Design a protein with these regions (language model features):
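N-terminal structured subdomain of primase-like DNA metabolism proteins
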Residues: 1-109
Length: 109
């Protein structure tokens, strides 16, 4: 199993990652203001995407601020999810106290 999938398995398909890093309280499937920019309307929510089998954030006001828990973690921590993906994974494992060894493994973005 790859590291990304193992994180998803241990975090309720990414929902716990959103709960940990989200600087505001939210309820899945309920709209809130996006904390990543000065959002004027509550048009953002966290939902379970059946196609990818994980939780995702969707911002209907600004599509550029939508993505999965790995994208969101990168945005919060100031990482580039494409070039620093392993940093994102190791940050999640460390910050959430997941019992996942981080040796040389497949990350599978």
């Amino acid at each position: 199993m790859n590291l990304k999938e193992e994180i998803l398995q241990k975090t309720n398909r990414g929902l716990e990652v959103f709960y940990f890093y989200m600087p505001i309280e939210f309820v899945p499937k309920r709209n809130f203001r996006n904390p990543l920019y000065d959002d004027k309307r509550a048009s953002c929510n966290i939902y379970f995407d059946t196609q990818s089998q994980c939780y995702r954030m969707k911002d209907f006001g600004n599509e550029a601020y939508s993505g999965d828990c790995f994208w969101f973690t990168a945005a919060i921590l100031g990482f580039d999810v494409r070039t620093e993906f392993i940093k994102v994974l190791t940050s999640i494992i460390h910050d959430l106290g997941l019992n996942i060894p981080i040796k040389e493994r497949k990350t599978s973005e």
